Amino acid sequence: MTPKKLWYALAAVILLSFGVLGFFGLEIFRTMPPFPTKVVTTDGTTLFEGQDIKDGQNVWQSIGGQTVGSVWGHGAYIAPDWSADYLHREAELLLKKLAERDGLDYASLPAAEQAKYQVLLREEVRKNTFDEATGVITYSPLRAEVARELGAYYAKLFLGDTSPEFVKLRSAYALRDKSLEDPRKMEQMSAFFAWASWVCVTNRPGTDVSYTNNWPHDPTIGNIAPTSLHLWSGFSVLMLLTCVGILVYYYAQSKEDEVGVLPTSDPLRGMKPTPSMRATTKYIWIVSLLILVQMVLGAITAHYGVEGDALFGLPIQDFLPQAVSRSWHVQLAILWIATSWLATGLYIAPAVSGVEPKFQRLGVNVLFGALLFVVVGSLVGQWFGVMQKLGLIENFWLGHQGYEYVELGRLWQILLLVGLVLWLFLMIRALIPALKRKDENRHLLTLFIIASLAIAFFYAAGLMYGRQTHMAIAEYWRWWVVHLWVEGFFEVFATVVAAFLFCRLGLLRIQSATVSVLFSTIIFLSGGILGTFHHLYFSATPTAVLALGATFSALEIVPLVLIGMEAYHNYKLSKSTDWIEAYKWPIYCFIAMCFWNFLGAGIFGFAINPPIALYYLQGLNTTAVHGHAALFGVYGILGIGLMLFCLRGLYPDYKWNDKLIGTAFWMINIGLFLMVTVSVLPIGILQAHESITNAYWSARSAEFMQQDHMQLIRWMRMPGDLLLGIGELLLVVFIFGLQFGWSRKGTR
């Protein structure tokens, strides 16, 4: 297929996919669960106002939001899902009170009698009592009484009740002794929990399925998997098999266009780095340090799972609570991975064009300072927010937004977007001379610029929701950032960069690389753009979103099935000629990326991808398995590989200390594999069994998670964590050793 036809196909995929994505974004807005004006009882008593719910959402976000447990399944894993937890406790109290109304003790009743009260419970909680004319939700006096009791329970939990029961529970949840100081804020957060759980159990108008597609699984209240989950899960598997067959046929009948005669020496050996290319060295140094800090924060966060109020006896909750350590751990992962790729772009652009624009080094240095300011400022702001030193409005702008992966305050988001636009400007001005030549590189250059544009501007999706935007809408835009920005266009960018590198090394023909990259981008984006919806199955979205997410996210797995071919191709390149040995470890990172793409994104990703699977598994440790294996295993190791390619060009005259970088490489990969498979995966499997057998709330409960064997399995991640941590430390030592000498082993 010619590049021209591939461009038409790519344009069609992008336009159609974003058209559908936008249309159903409007559909989510149209059908989202209502924010009531107030919640009242049948006798007219006001339980809480609608504004209390919105303010309560901000209160929850200010204590860490999705880094302190989760709501609707999105968030952290140590504390419970508050919507599921509230629902379960509400159901228990209602059953008890319904039986007491008849002079009976529910717990001592036979199963047949309990079933009668469970029917009454479902009639009570599943009926949609929202009045569209008045905007009011109506509770029965009994349910209102339960809501008040639950408000008192959560007040004891978050305001620091010192009774042994709540001290123990806070430790199990890794909560601060006093997550909140203000009782009024606690009332508002309880109202938010009540509304979030109401959304999970209340039937959509005209249906017998809740706003969240009956998530979370809880048979007691009638939350069981609806028919649509089974149907679209089956359809997604059929789509996967069909498209895999088509892709296998395409590869089988395609001929590999290999380079006939390989260069006898390194084509890049004589290239002298320009001043702006040399200026990217400090980016790599800072990224390596951020990797270390992020690793330490990850270890602290993981330890909170076994010792919820301290670190080996040290009371660090007082100054580094779990909400902060986890926020920093996740945020730094995004920032260092993104920065490594941005630095690669700044290094590659002048190398591709052969031109150093005037003041390019100044621009690279200014951008470095700006990014450093955003990183430090956002982390400090998050600490002030979680420690309750900011008001709700100030917290939104400067502190902690409460949404995973976009925790940083809105001001820092805006400044980061400005930095990305500056990066785009620096990229384009360096590439313009190459574009003007209109040679055989133009197709890859055009795709390079398109990917750069997407990286700069798609981050703006994180600005599309406000401080009190409905969570269904905020989740929609949040996943634009996480799925499309991080997982989507950064991957396209990396594919183009890798193609340029291999072409410049003389290992690939530019024509075949162009066709391969365009085809890969079409395949990837065909499933990837609309695959965004698979994150939104249970985020109060309509069934059509579930159907699209299941179908198109299955297509994301299709190219991963044949990724072994890419790994083998990269391995062959690493052995193709003597001088390529200098690029062994960057290429090995690409091979490792292929492995983790298959295992982390492919196997572990598809394990939780079908709606019927995610219905039981959302927010369990199975999600953490996929997250670590895919985010660090794929994007992190790819970022490390790209940095090593840049370092090879920045220090062209020296052989590397293979023992040092090789040990780092293998320890990082083996450590990650052990951490994921020996500890996190077994916990996820045990949780999955509990969620399927009993209910979702039980799989997240302190009673289940604090069992002795669960504690033992959590401790079993130590060997993997240690290997990974030492490997990352050795990587940093190697990177700085290229500058200071200990990573050099003579001249080339």
Please name every model-derived segment.
Residues 91, 258-270, 440-446, 696-700:
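Juxtamembrane inter-helical linkers in multi-pass membrane proteins
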Residues 7-28, 60, 68, 205, ...:
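Hydrophobic cores of alpha-helical transmembrane segments in multi-pass integral membrane proteins
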Residues 213-238, 269-279:
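Cytosolic-side membrane-insertion boundary helix
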Residues 402-410, 473-483, 541-552, 618-624:
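Non-cytosolic membrane-interface motifs at loop->transmembrane helix junctions
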Residues 31-229:
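Soluble extramembrane regions of membrane proteins in the secretory/endomembrane system
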